[in-house]
Amino acid sequence: MNDTTQPTKGDAVKKILALILGLCLIVPVISIAGCVGGGNSQPSNNEKPSTIIIRTTGATFPKYQIQKWIEDYQKTHPNVKIEYEGGGSGYGQEAFAKGLTDIGRTDPPVKESMWKKFLSTGDQPLQFPEIVGAVVVTYNIPEIGDKTLKLSRDVLADIFLGKIEYWDDERIKKINPEIADKLPHEKIIVVHRSDASGTTAIFTTYLSLISKEWAEKVGAGKTVNWPTDNIGRGVAGKGNPGVVAIVKSTPYTVAYTELSYAIEQKLPVAALENKNGKFVKPTDETIKAAVSAVKASIPNPTEGYKEDLKQMLDAPGDNAYPIVAFTHLLVWENKNGKHYSPEKAKAIKDFLTWVLTEGQKPEHLAPGYVGLPEDVAKIGLNAVNMIKE
């Protein structure tokens, strides 16, 4: 009979436990909590903070400026991701009202009727200007290339009314003697926005200021019934990008768009007759001249505007470009955490504070935009400080 004892089940368990303990001692990267079990391991100090996503929606007027701000801001704030979607001012207002975006963007300020819709959510909306831009008239006339076209106030209105049919119309030639012999006998195709657009609201408000006929027959708004559509010389494009794409690819077109889009696509822009009778092209200097010429009256950030604010349109001054306007931001006061988590509210406040301070400096401005006057930026900063975390 053999005297050797067989290993018991208990001995095997002891050996396994000893092996596990040895591994814990030999391999320091395995946590003790993992070895002994029980409880979740705590995150190390080296782990990156979670990313906060801020969504902003609406106006395409400030598109290139928004993209510039996002790019510059995220370089020093890698834990914040800002997503921008265009769609136009009307879309931005609706998305904001429905809680589909954190920050709404609209060129014309929100009027009292829509403001009441915002208030019905149980939270306090806030609105204020974020940047200054210009609406320009761009064109595609191959015969004149990149030479500047001058447009007087009455000629501009009559082109968009459809009353001037051909590019070689005597009224256009008279104010453009340098290129008169090059202007072709081709029909003028008017390109306009297909969506509810703040750029359209700015441009049609300006046309209403300079043309009684336009004011009476068409009026101003984010959408209007374009006279040239009724005579087969109107084409619609979605957003500022859609409009400039049509102009760039279609000879004998004329359109309105935000200055930065014309710069980006290397399209010519017209010199428009201003209030003082001078023909002025849009530049930093002429846009600033319009801003300084007009003392804008901006309501409290907690109030809707009683009417579309004309602001700097048709400003006086020899060097003032005539179609200059603010574009606006919409945010919530966030009563009782209604729309933002504490983390998101803090991130929004930090981003918008940066936009209204550092973001207004030349190094953070995209071509075609001008920073806010200091007193206007302060209105926005006061609003940002009202956001509750």
Swiss-Prot record:
The complex is composed of two ATP-binding proteins (PstB), two transmembrane proteins (PstC and PstA) and a solute-binding protein (PstS). Its main location: membrane. GO terms for biological process: phosphate ion transmembrane transport. The gene is pstS. It is found in: Cell membrane. It comes from Methanocaldococcus jannaschii (strain ATCC 43067 / DSM 2661 / JAL-1 / JCM 10045 / NBRC 100440) (Methanococcus jannaschii). The chain crosses the membrane at residues 16-36. This is Phosphate-binding protein PstS. The keyword Transferase does not apply. It comes from the Archaea. Belongs to the PstS family. One of its GO terms (cellular component) is ATP-binding cassette (ABC) transporter complex. InterPro entries: ABC_phos-bd_PstS (IPR005673), PBP_domain (IPR024370), Phosphate-bind_PstS (IPR050962). Keywords: Cell membrane, Membrane, Phosphate transport, Transmembrane, Transmembrane helix, Transport. GO terms for molecular function: phosphate ion binding. It is a single-pass membrane protein. Part of the ABC transporter complex PstSACB involved in phosphate import. Phosphate binds at A59, T60, F61, S89, D107, S197, G198, T199.
